[in-house]
């Protein structure tokens, strides 16, 4: 899986460096953060709906869309996968106390 995600990220980076006519990725990068963020919000909402409907196939499809749009945002903001990996590694194994986290009470 790591190779597939890295390949997707590299493809998005390549589109930024060498735009391809008609590319959806280039469209998003050209429109900028507001458009990318709107798409992330839409796709996250679709994940929530799929999960509420207990539709595994749709959850998987919509999560792929979320990951793609998040990768586009990272590329747009010049954030590398290595930076994300470093942060994940730093958090791995740390104990997080639930009482220190803000309660989500809007559901």
UniProtKB/Swiss-Prot annotation:
Pathway: Amino-acid biosynthesis; L-histidine biosynthesis; L-histidine from 5-phospho-alpha-D-ribose 1-diphosphate: step 2/9. GO terms for molecular function: ATP binding; phosphoribosyl-ATP diphosphatase activity. GO terms for biological process: L-histidine biosynthetic process. InterPro entries: HisE, PRib-ATP_PPHydrolase-like. Coiled coil: none annotated. It is an enzyme of class 3 (hydrolase). Keywords: Amino-acid biosynthesis, ATP-binding, Cytoplasm, Histidine biosynthesis, Hydrolase, Nucleotide-binding. SUPFAM superfamilies: all-alpha NTP pyrophosphatases. Its EC number is 3.6.1.31. It catalyses: 1-(5-phospho-beta-D-ribosyl)-ATP + H2O = 1-(5-phospho-beta-D-ribosyl)-5'-AMP + diphosphate + H(+). It is found in: Cytoplasm. Belongs to the PRA-PH family. This is Phosphoribosyl-ATP pyrophosphatase. It comes from Bacillus cytotoxicus (strain DSM 22905 / CIP 110041 / 391-98 / NVH 391-98).
